[in-house]
UniProtKB/Swiss-Prot annotation:
Gene3D superfamilies: 3.30.1320.10. GO terms for molecular function: structural constituent of ribosome. It comes from the Bacteria. The gene is rpsP. The lineage of its organism: Bacteria, Pseudomonadati, Pseudomonadota, Gammaproteobacteria, Cellvibrionales. It comes from Saccharophagus degradans (strain 2-40 / ATCC 43961 / DSM 17024). This is Small ribosomal subunit protein bS16. GO terms for biological process: translation. One of its GO terms (cellular component) is small ribosomal subunit. Keywords: Ribonucleoprotein, Ribosomal protein.
């Protein structure tokens, strides 16, 4: 099954996450199909906190990809803010 979930990057005590489309059997930070955005939980000042390529996200959702709970919440919050 294809899923849309967060993949962790960044450094110690300063996380950064990519929204990735991946096979659900792969590891969290392993091989992915496509990156469709990012989430920076520790963004300060003018730094961008969340970016989602909505066109690609909608494409993958139409193909049957399942969002993780956290990604679904982020998408919902981004839609409300826009």
């Amino acid at each position: 099954m294809v899923s849309i979930r967060l993949s962790r990057g960044g450094s110690k005590k300063r996380p950064f996450y990519h929204l990735t489309v991946t096979d659900s059997r792969k590891s969290r930070d392993g091989r992915f199909i496509e990156r469709v955005g990012f989430f920076n939980p520790v963004a300060r000042g003018q730094e961008e906190r969340l970016r989602v390529e909505s066109e690609r996200l909608n494409y993958w959702l139409s193909q049957g990809a399942q969002c993780s709970e956290r990604v679904a919440k982020l998408i919902k919050d981004a839609a409300a803010a826009a």
